[in-house]
A protein has these predicted regions:
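Short amphipathic alpha-helical signal-transduction/dimerization elements
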Residues: 25, 84-88, 138-145
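Short, solvent-exposed loop/turn segments at the edges of secondary structure
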Residues: 1-2, 43-46, 54-59, 74-75, ...
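M16 family metallopeptidases and their MPP-like homologs
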Residues: 3-9, 58-68, 94-200, 220-225
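Proteolytic maturation boundary segments
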Residues: 5, 13-53, 59, 94, ...
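Solvent-exposed, non-transmembrane alpha-helical starts
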Residues: 19, 70-74, 129-134, 232-233
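Active/ligand-binding-proximal structured segments within catalytic/core domains
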Residues: 62, 72-84, 92-94
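Secretory-pathway/luminal and periplasmic proteins that interact with or process carbohydrate-rich
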Residues: 27-34, 89, 163-171
Length: 250
């Protein structure tokens, strides 16, 4: 029980719920939990590129590795993601998708314990190379780094982020998810609750500083090209024939 959590959200009777938990889990005994340690990954100092081939449509994806949830800057990452892409008025939405410079594009973040990730992806237009689509994505990162975005975009991104969080909080499943995530990431629940207020105070200069600090030539690019996949084949094993006694009854 010292390495698990029972997450409940909804219209519950606290006293009855506690009784049920004690009845079903009360005899669990504490055990020593070994502390997990890991070797930090080597720093990426130049772009790493790889190509995969398959029959599906072509795309390009760019990934950055960022600090984990305990880092003092990580709370800004979801806001950076929303500034770039929020389905309506992010830099990628306005400059690439609505201007039809690529067929489609997006960006998203994933905050985890040891490291977080940030990823941008695009599907090229007909006649457009994956390298051209890649450069268009990177150009939007550069706009963050130079502060080349309208002043209204940051307050709008903050309001949009808070609105989405409020709407999702109407559902028990989302509230349970937030508590589960906080438990897994070892976050103080008070910090999770105050995250929106903290995010509301982020300035444009903080966005610029964040982008310059973490978005350098330290990314990985995957080019998905159209073609016949040349995947290694597993040799088919010899199958032993099984004699069936169809006329035998037991």
């Amino acid at each position: 029980p010292n390495n698990m959590a029972i997450i409940l959200a909804g219209d519950i009777d606290p006293d009855k719920t506690i009784d049920l938990i004690k009845k079903n889990f009360g005899e669990y005994k504490n055990k020593e939990v070994p502390k997990f340690t890991f070797e930090p990954e080597a720093e990426i100092t130049e772009p790493i590129e790889t190509t995969v081939v398959g029959p599906d449509a072509e795309w390009v994806s760019i990934g950055y590795r960022l600090p984990g949830v305990k880092n003092e800057d990580t709370y800004i990452l979801p806001l950076v993601s929303s500034l770039l892409y929020n389905y309506q008025a992010g830099l990628i939405d306005l400059n690439l998708v609505k201007d039809q410079k690529v067929l489609s594009a997006n960006a998203y973040d994933d905050v985890s314990y040891d490291y977080s990730t940030f990823q941008l992806s695009a599907n090229p237009r007909d006649g457009q190379t994956l390298e051209e689509a890649r450069d268009l994505l990177l150009s939007q990162i550069e706009k963050l780094k130079t502060g080349d975005f309208e002043d209204w975009m940051l307050p709008a991104a903050i309001k949009n982020f808070k609105l989405q969080d409020q709407q999702r909080n109407l559902y028990n499943s989302y509230r349970a998810y937030k508590m589960t995530n906080a438990f897994i990431l070892e976050q103080n629940w008070a910090d999770v609750v105050e995250e929106n207020d903290k995010m509301s105070k982020v300035t444009k200069q903080q966005i610029v500083d964040f982008a310059n600090k973490y978005f350098k030539n330290n990314y990985v690019v995957v080019y998905k090209k159209h073609g016949e996949a040349n995947n290694p084949k597993v040799e088919k094993p010899q199958i032993t024939k099984v004699d069936l006694n169809r006329d035998t009854a037991s």
